[in-house]
Design a protein with these regions (language model features):
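C-terminal substrate-binding/catalytic lobe of Rossmann-fold NAD(P)-dependent dehydrogenases
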Residues: 1-213, 217-218
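C-terminal amphipathic alpha-helical interaction region
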Residues: 198-199, 203-267
Length: 267
């Protein structure tokens, strides 16, 4: 969104990520992202990242994570969206053919304040990061219960702080959350992390809304936000899904006003 909506060049993005790495987003991946934007191709003099073909390969760890999550019923939409994003990127020939055919808004049509959007993206990235880790740690907790692993989630976060590509300053906050409450069901329920998310919600929503309005795909941001909104919903429209399942397949349903399992004739 920084590149497409604001038209930022590689050297500008490098400066932004370098600055972000000095604060709460301090992490290995932010650090190397800044370095990637700085690298100039020796032959052409252009930013090397602009010459890299936009087809992301994968070794399978993301796919395995998604598969395992489905097996134990753990919702990890942000991780799933990352896997799907790579798969969609691999459809390069199809995307090139679709680009002039499928209509969409002008992606360079952002008319708001440039610096405000940059700051909003920074806040949205941090909030999305909390949401993504909440999903991942929740999955580990559910796997620990399912397979009797007896995992210490705070210790796992501490281990990740060194010698791992996801090492980040933020992991200290995860460890602290589990020190405060070892049986924490979800990181979003931690008082400090929950406050951090709520403070960044306006910026987070603004970024997703802006991206959607400009036709810029931001699956990580949007999946993370949808997870947050779903998790905080006392009631979801899944009652309609279950009613449909009972209608076409007699899969039964539970009621809100009494115990038991029921099947109805819907016609």
């Amino acid at each position: 969104i920084l590149q497409r909506a604001l038209g930022l060049k590689a050297h500008e993005l490098a400066a932004i990520f370098t600055e972000w790495n000095q604060g709460e987003l301090d992490s290995y991946l932010i650090e190397i992202t800044a370095k990637i934007f700085q690298r100039i191709d020796d032959e052409t003099g252009q930013p090397l990242v602009n010459l890299v073909l936009d087809k992301a390969a994968q070794k399978g760890t993301g796919k395995w994570t998604s598969q395992d999550a489905f097996d134990i019923g753990a919702p990890i939409p942000t991780i799933n969206s990352a896997v799907v994003g790579r798969i969609v990127s691999s459809l390069k020939t199809e995307r090139v053919a679709a680009a002039p055919i499928l209509p969409g808004p002008d992606r360079s049509g952002y008319e708001g304040d440039r610096n405000q959007l940059i700051e909003a993206v920074r806040q949205a990235l941090y909030a999305s990061k909390i949401s993504a880790y909440a999903q991942g740690m929740s999955m580990l907790r559910m796997a620990s219960d399912e397979y009797d692993y007896d995992l210490n989630l705070g210790e796992i976060a501490a281990i990740w702080r060194a010698g791992c590509i996801i090492r980040a300053r933020f992991l200290n906050r995860i460890t602290d959350a589990y020190v405060r409450k070892p049986d924490l069901a979800n990181l979003l329920l931690d008082e400090e992390l929950g406050k951090a998310v709520s403070e960044r919600l306006p910026a987070w929503r603004h970024v997703v809304q802006t991206a959607v309005g400009l036709g810029i795909p931001v699956p990580g941001f949007s999946a993370s936000l949808a997870y947050y909104d779903s998790y905080r919903s006392e009631r979801l429209p899944a009652n309609l899904i279950q009613a449909q399942r009972d209608f076409f397949g007699a899969h039964t349903y539970e009621r809100t006003d009494r115990d038991g399992v029921y099947h109805s004739s819907w016609e």
